[in-house]
């Protein structure tokens, strides 16, 4: 027990945590040099392509320290992006300490700060590490001051290393062994194991990543899931050295994987406690707080035959990603699908890509919306996550939109640009503090504006230097309206959007213009209108294609031409009554880009 160290690495995106973990694995001999490749722990193709960590991974390594002792390091890699902060809090729950990795050139960023506070709230020992000291732009002294000033932990003797060149990585390991406390727990008490993560394997069923808090788990034991009371057999268990290695037992304080041949996806939920069936523990371990999705979007399979496969895929994915929420939904335009809740737009993109790649599905996504709180005239309060569920205007007493509290850290020279952006997004400044050359800004901005494209625009106005962390603050009454799109007089539910009354005419006009470019021309005119209630605010027409019926007439009487034109006109009229308009996938995505052109 005293030689076990459980830790994770927290850092902002691109501050080098995956590279540092590669070096740690190499030094401890977890993989032979032949098997070593860059970013070993980012095993998903998607993670490698985008260069970000999405899933938390765990590795168990043996490290022979300078004091002659051999320590078992259980190391859990965590993502750095704001949309995956839930993964981080799950990983931290299994640790006693964390390495706070900060880029010695860039300094502290908002995300580092948020994850660091999460770690401190859980009473973890935070060990600061200054990475990338081999870069010419590195200024470790300034960054150490910044860490002390902004984060408030002592950093003057922070370990300095360069994960890329391998300089100072052994110092990191020595400091880790010295500063991070060993796990607490009673090896003789009844078994209590916390499920940190689980995923679905086609051959083994559900595989769970567990942290043993008390007692010992042995192969072949009967194991009980505390929330459901189901009993399973521990068929296989072991550790990752990044490869799966079988063991006969997992001892108190260790982190490892477990296979119990659970075929039911909901058999072992994340955050649940496992105990021995023979000698069960009295109470479950405190799990994780459930996260509320911030962004909702409808996902529909392109062909309705894929619905079953889509449902299974979502089930398997939600096992692996506990922050994904979904419920069935049907749309008149798109058929049957699911309404899914995500933590942010990046999360939504990643889930959609994983569904398309790993499960081979073709999907249509509707525009993302946030949850609104609506008080009806009969004084009941309902929560609306889709524009089509919004009650009629005359039944709404008050519509409240979610407000996000945004913490931004940025260099002083970009302050003006960022403030302009926040004001444009209907933001209200609540705080501003200067730390050396950095400024910490706090704004309250409507969640709908934040999730749409705020992050991208913040990055572009500040040349990538500003960083953002946001969380839900409260609901606030606001003058929001629903803009409907009518095509040939029929409402298309999948194209509706909720927007602020002041922006509605611009958004409506822009949407109608975009639709006009995307809908292919037919044999008859297609009228595209944007409406608030019964009030039309914008209109555009996709002109018909027409055959020149007068081509065969040479000269002759005008009544002959009139007759032909009249005949054509009647045909078009009849066609318009029965004709229906096919909307291409791009049309549904056009809503995403409304308001992007800085309007």
Swiss-Prot record:
Q: Which Pfam families match?
A: EFG_C, GTP_EFTU, GTP_EFTU_D2, LepA_C
Q: How does it sit in the membrane?
A: Peripheral membrane protein
Biological processes annotated in GO: positive regulation of translation
Under InterPro entries, the record lists:
EF-4, EFG_III/V, EFG_V-like, EFTu-like_2, G_TR_CS, LepA_C_sf, LepA_CTD, LepA_IV
Annotated localization = Cell inner membrane
Enzyme class, broadest EC rank: hydrolase
- Location of the tr-type G domain: 2-184
Where is GTP annotated to bind? 14-19, 131-134
Q: Name one GO molecular function term.
A: GTP binding
User: What EC number(s) does the entry state?
Assistant: 3.6.5.n1
Q: Which GO terms describe its cellular component?
A: plasma membrane
Matching entries from SUPFAM superfamilies are given as: EF-G C-terminal domain-like, P-loop containing nucleoside triphosphate hydrolases
Ordered alphabetically, the record's keywords are: Cell inner membrane, Cell membrane, GTP-binding, Hydrolase, Membrane, Nucleotide-binding, Protein biosynthesis
Free-text function comment from the UniProt entry: Required for accurate and efficient protein synthesis under certain stress conditions. May act as a fidelity factor of the translation reaction, by catalyzing a one-codon backward translocation of tRNAs on improperly translocated ribosomes. Back-translocation proceeds from a post-translocation (POST) complex to a pre-translocation (PRE) complex, thus giving elongation factor G a second chance to translocate the tRNAs correctly. Binds to ribosomes in a GTP-dependent manner.
NCBIfam families to which the protein is assigned, alphabetical: lepA, small_GTP
Family under the similarity heading: Belongs to the TRAFAC class translation factor GTPase superfamily. Classic translation factor GTPase family. LepA subfamily.
Name this polypeptide is given: Elongation factor 4
Source organism? Klebsiella pneumoniae subsp. pneumoniae (strain ATCC 700721 / MGH 78578)
Upper lineage is:
Bacteria, Pseudomonadati, Pseudomonadota, Gammaproteobacteria, Enterobacterales
């Amino acid at each position: 027990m005293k030689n076990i160290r459980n830790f994770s690495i927290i850092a902002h995106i691109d501050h080098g945590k995956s590279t540092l973990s590669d070096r740690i694995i190499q030094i401890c001999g977890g993989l032979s040099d032949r098997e070593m490749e860059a970013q070993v722990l980012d095993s998903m193709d998607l993670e490698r392509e985008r260069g970000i960590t999405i899933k938390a991974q765990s590795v168990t390594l043996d490290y022979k320290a300078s004091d002659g002792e051999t320590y078992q390091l259980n190391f859990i890699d965590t993502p750095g992006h704001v949309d995956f902060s839930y993964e981080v809090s799950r990983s931290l729950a299994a640790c006693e300490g964390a390495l706070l990795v900060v880029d010695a050139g860039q300094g502290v960023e908002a995300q580092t700060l948020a994850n660091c506070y999460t770690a401190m709230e859980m009473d973890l020992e935070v060990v600061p590490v200054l990475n990338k000291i081999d870069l010419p732009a590195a200024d470790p002294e300034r960054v150490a001051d910044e860490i002390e000033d902004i984060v408030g932990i002592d950093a003057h003797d922070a370990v300095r290393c360069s994960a890329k060149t391998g300089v100072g990585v052994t110092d990191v390991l020595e400091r880790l062994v010295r500063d991070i406390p060993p796990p607490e727990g009673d090896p003789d008490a009844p078994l209590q194991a916390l499920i940190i993560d689980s995923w679905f394997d086609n051959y083994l069923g559900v595989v769970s990543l567990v942290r043993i808090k008390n007692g010992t788990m042995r192969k072949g034991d009967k194991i009980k899931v505390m929330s459901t009371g189901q009993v399973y057999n521990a068929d296989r268990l072991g550790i990752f050295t990044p490869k799966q290695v079988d063991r006969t037992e997992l001892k108190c304080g260790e982190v490892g994987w477990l296979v119990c041949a659970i075929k039911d996806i909901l058999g072992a939920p994340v955050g649940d406690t496992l105990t021995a069936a023979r000698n069960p523990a009295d109470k479950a371990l405190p799990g994780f707080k459930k996260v509320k999705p911030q962004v909702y979007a409808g996902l529909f399979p392109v062909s309705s035959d894929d619905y079953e496969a889509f449902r299974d895929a979502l089930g398997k994915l939600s096992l692996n990603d506990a922050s994904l929420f979904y419920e069935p939904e049907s749309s008149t335009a798109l058929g049957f699908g699911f309404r899914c809740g995500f933590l942010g737009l990046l999360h939504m993109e990643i889930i959609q890509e994983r569904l398309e790649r790993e499960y081979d599905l073709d999907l249509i996504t509707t525009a993302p919306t946030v949850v609104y709180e609506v008080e009806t005239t009969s004084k009941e309060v309902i929560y609306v996550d889709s524009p089509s569920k919004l009650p009629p205007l005359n039944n709404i007493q008050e519509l409240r939109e979610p407000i996000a509290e945004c913490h931004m850290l940025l260099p002083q020279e970009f302050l003006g640009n960022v403030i302009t952006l926040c004001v444009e997004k209907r933001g209200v400044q609540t705080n501003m503090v200067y730390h050396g050359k950095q400024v910490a800004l706090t704004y309250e901005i409507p969640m709908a504006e934040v999730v749409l494209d705020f992050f991208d625009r913040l990055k572009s106005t500040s040349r990538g230097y500003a960083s953002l962390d946001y969380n839900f603050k409260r609901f606030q009454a606001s003058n929001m309206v629903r803009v409907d799109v009518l095509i040939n007089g029929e409402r298309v539910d999948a194209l509706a959007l909720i927007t602020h009354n002041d922006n509605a005419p611009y958004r409506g006009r822009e949407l109608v213009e975009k639709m006009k470019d995307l809908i292919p021309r037919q044999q008859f005119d297609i009228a595209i209108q944007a409406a608030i209630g019964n009030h039309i605010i914008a209109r555009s027409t996709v002109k018909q294609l027409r055959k020149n019926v007068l081509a065969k007439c040479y000269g002759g009487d005008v009544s002959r031409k009139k007759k032909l034109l009249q005949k054509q006109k009647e045909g078009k009229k009849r066609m318009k009554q029965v004709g229906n308009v096919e909307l291409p996938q791009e049309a549904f995505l056009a809503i995403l880009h409304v308001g992007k052109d800085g309007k």
